Design a protein with these regions (language model features):
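A structural signal for short, hydrophobic beta-strand segments that form beta-sheets
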Residues: 2-5
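Catalytic cores of secreted/periplasmic lytic hydrolases that degrade extracellular macromolecules
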Residues: 7-15, 21, 26-101, 112-211
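Pyridoxal 5′-phosphate
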Residues: 109
Length: 211
């Protein structure tokens, strides 16, 4: 028996040339369907993906998940994201921010690390850049890790948590630009591109599908 689809009540399964539906409660054993535990875990994580999901909490992915989905991407020609998969995971755990969102934002802003700002300044987000002189104004980081962590802290403190919300290291959020912990909420004060949420979500969806 091979599991094709799974929800709380029903499973779509195949056996040889047959396809049918059975109650989920009947297919909860690895002995009945090898791999069902992992498939169920992945499907539950994927089911949380939504364009309006809250980004001020971890994704639920493991370190191995991060390594898997950020490895062997043809567009990641310099292996920047592959080499920093653990950084995105650790930042997620440390600061309570969805690490897949953060990686997707970096992919979008840097063109998979191919932008001049990303390569010269190890700045995957265009952080600090102004429209009139983006390269000159963008912050320079010593490492990609430093840049990822800096932007994560900045978003947690100013964008995705309400004022006075408890955040990392017993600090409180300023909530300066808070308009909700979602892509649309962030983009309201973060950028001028009205399609920014859609563009970032496209990469989030791509990465979640690689689980």
């Amino acid at each position: 028996v091979t599991l094709q689809e799974l929800n709380d009540e029903w499973c779509k399964v195949t056996y040889e040339s047959y396809t049918g539906y059975v109650k989920s409660s009947l297919l909860t054993s690895e002995a009945v369907t090898p791999g069902i535990g992992e498939k169920n875990r992945v499907q539950k994580i994927r089911s949380t993906l939504d364009a309006n999901m809250s980004l001020n909490k971890p994704s639920g992915l493991t370190l191995e998940d991060f390594k898997k989905i950020l490895s062997n991407n043809a567009s990641d020609t310099n292996k920047i994201f592959e080499q920093n998969a653990e950084v995105f995971y650790n930042v997620e755990q440390k600061y309570n921010i969805n690490g897949i969102f953060l990686a997707s934002m970096a992919i979008h802003e840097s063109g998979w690390g191919s932008s001049k700002i990303a390569k010269d300044k190890k700045n995957l987000f265009g952080f600090g850049a102004y429209d009139r002189s983006p390269y000159d104004s963008a912050v320079t980081f010593a490492t990609y890790e430093e840049g990822i962590e800096t932007v994560a802290k900045y978003l947690v403190k100013n964008y995705i948590n309400e004022k006075n919300a408890k955040i990392y290291n017993n600090e409180t959020a300023t909530g300066t630009y808070y308009n909700g912990p979602t892509l649309v909420g962030i983009s309201t004060r973060y950028c001028t591109d009205k399609d920014w949420p859609t563009k970032v979500y496209k990469y989030m969806n791509y990465l979640y599908e690689r689980l």
